[in-house]
Amino acid sequence: MIIRPGSIVSALQKLSCLAAVLGLAGIAPAIAAEPKPDAAVKMKYIDASVTLEKQIRTNAPLAENLLAEGKHWIEENRGNAAKEFKASPELFRDGRAWTFERSYAQTSNVGGRYVSIVRTDYVYTGGAHPNTLIDTILWNDETRKQISIRPFFKETADNGPTLKALRDAAIAAVKAEKKERGIEDSGDIDWYQGILPALLKVGAISLAPSTVAGKSAGLAFHYSPYAVGPYAEGSYTVFVPWETFKAHLSPQGLAIFGGDRPPDTKPDAE
């Protein structure tokens, strides 16, 4: 499960108090400092931040692109929060500002060209609990642009053979992960009806790392909480080996896939 970024005030206060106690006791705290946000806005009605993983910061064009996207996201949410604050100020009493935290993490670099990024948004605007939204970005280091996985396949038409194969493989992988977690789906809800044979609806996709240098072992599908199960189940990241969809790969796709997933790869590292 992907861990949400933690800049909640109470959590930081607890860490600060613990560090102070350890310092007074002459013990060096072994708690790693929270990464400093690359962009942040804090006002009466909003507490928002964007954080780039250290590895991303070393890639200047990529970092610039993602940071611009993140700042736009902050500004959009700031505007919405400002309107709500003006219309219903009582919702923001006692320091109850809306919280928006976005983090970008690099999960693979295939052939020194294709960089997979997982974008995680933590959002709380009141209600029973916060929401975590997960999406992915594929970056081409040569063209310095965000791209799609479409060129890796012979065709990617909605309801076409490629997307149907990917849809079926993704659902099977989620069911296998649920079985491993000891979770049984309720017969009252079809949690897989939202996974459709369309590139934008089959799931957030990233290129999984491989045991072969410069290759990808397959596709990782990332699902936010609520996407394929109740909120309590959390998020899912599942793996589909490249051999499963080999018949649908274009020459460009055949060139980047190969090998197996490293045995020590954790789901949230894909």
Where are these regions (language model features)?
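Bacterial N-terminal signal peptides that target proteins for export
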Residues: I2-L18
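Compositionally biased intrinsically disordered regions enriched in Thr/Gly
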Residues: I31-E270
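Repetitive helical segments and hydrophobic/amphipathic motifs
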Residues: L22-G23
